[in-house]
């Protein structure tokens, strides 16, 4: 049986690092999406204040199953 997935782009942030920022993105998206099947970190960035990184950010593509009524 063939299947279809939809992909959305979200941005997660954390003061603790890029991995945590990506996890935040997946965790929060999973609260409102069913069938999350994969994630791909597309880019990473950070906020800097007074020469120090204050927030790590990841732009994440999240794939989830498209449900069929068939």
Q: Regions from the language model: what does each represent?
A:
Residues 17, 46, 65-69:
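Generic "edge-of-domain/loop-turn" microfeature
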Residues 5, 36-39, 53-59:
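Short connector loops at helix/strand junctions that flank enzyme active sites
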Residues 2-37:
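Short, well-ordered alpha-helical segments
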Residues 39-48:
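Short, conserved loop-to-beta-strand elements that form functional interface hotspots
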Residues 51-70:
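C-terminal structural segments of small proteins and small subunits
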Residues 4-7, 42, 70:
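N-terminal presequence-like segments and the immediate start of the first folded domain
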Residues 1-2, 62:
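Short N-terminal signal/transit or membrane-insertion segments
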Residues 8-10, 44, 58-64:
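A structural signal for short, well-ordered beta-strand segments
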């Amino acid at each position: 049986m063939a299947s279809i997935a939809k992909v959305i782009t979200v941005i997660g942030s954390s003061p603790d690092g890029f991995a945590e920022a990506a996890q935040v993105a997946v965790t929060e998206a999973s609260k409102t999406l069913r069938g999350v099947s994969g994630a791909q970190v597309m880019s990473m960035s950070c906020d800097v204040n007074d020469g120090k990184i204050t927030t790590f950010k990841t732009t994440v593509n999240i794939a989830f199953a498209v449900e069929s009524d068939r």
